Amino acid sequence: MRAIISLLLISAMVFSMIAAVPEEEGLQLSEDERGGCLPHNRFCNALSGPRCCSGLRCKELSIWDSTCLG
């Protein structure tokens, strides 16, 4: 009986470790996507920082809105 319980616990631990890897990769992709700028209207992505798509700099207009300076 102890062997069966131990085997189930080990299987659950291995499965949770395998399932966690794709989730971390998905989080990494979404963080990378956040770094870019929006291509339309030369507006910066809210989380892009000082970068813009065309090499211009972003100017924050508010917490959610910023625009590219020429």
From Swiss-Prot:
One of its GO terms (cellular component) is extracellular region. It comes from the Eukaryota. Transmembrane segments: none annotated. It is found in: Secreted. Keywords: Amidation, Disulfide bond, Knottin, Neurotoxin, Secreted, Signal, Toxin. GO terms for molecular function: toxin activity. Coiled coil: none annotated. Residues 21-34 form a propeptide. The keyword Membrane does not apply. The modification Leucine amide is found at residue 69. The keyword Amino-acid biosynthesis does not apply. Residues 1-20 form the signal peptide. Expressed by the venom gland. Disulfide bonds join 37-53, 44-58, 52-68. Belongs to the neurotoxin 01 (U2-agtx) family. The presence of a 'disulfide through disulfide knot' structurally defines this protein as a knottin. Insect active toxin causing rapid but reversible paralysis in crickets. No activity shown in mammals. Does not show effect on mammalian voltage-gated calcium channels. This is U2-agatoxin-Ao1j. It comes from Agelena orientalis.
